[in-house]
Amino acid sequence: MGNILDYLDWRGDLTFEQTPFNQVDNLILACFSYLDLDEIADVKNGNTLSVEELFEIFSGKEKDGEVKVESAFLQNTPILLEKMASSERFRKCRAGGYVNEILFRKAQQFSAVTVELPDGTAYISFRGTDDTIVGWKEDFNLSNGIVPSHRKALEYLDSTRRAFQGRKSGYVHGNAV
């Protein structure tokens, strides 16, 4: 059975103008939030990079040993980025607003990125919890109601709403926001 990487090989030649945004594109951008962009300052602080530019920087850092893929959740994300960057469909999309806050004492794990599609739609992707102790602790705390990451997500949505005037779309892991 095929996966999203196969989809990028198969249909990555089609732009969003040729074939509208679909459920597989939604999944690809949801997985995009799992990229470790901590060392790439240009996707933070109000700046954006095209997926193509992001891949060039990311692959340079990967070669220098600055990118470490330690989690099973992150294992295929460098491949995903490479395939997105080489596709007509995603290469010109712009990523920005990257946030990755892991606070052990608060049991808070908050990560998000916004991808601007060619039509100006801002796709907001929130990373879910992972297989770390902080991730597990936050998962357990979810059974008690609102966790600190929920508040951070609302703040992020508000700042994105102000930064991007066009349509908004997105994916929330756990559907909590």
Where are these regions (language model features)?
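Conserved alpha/beta-hydrolase "nucleophile elbow" surrounding the catalytic nucleophile
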Residues: 173-177
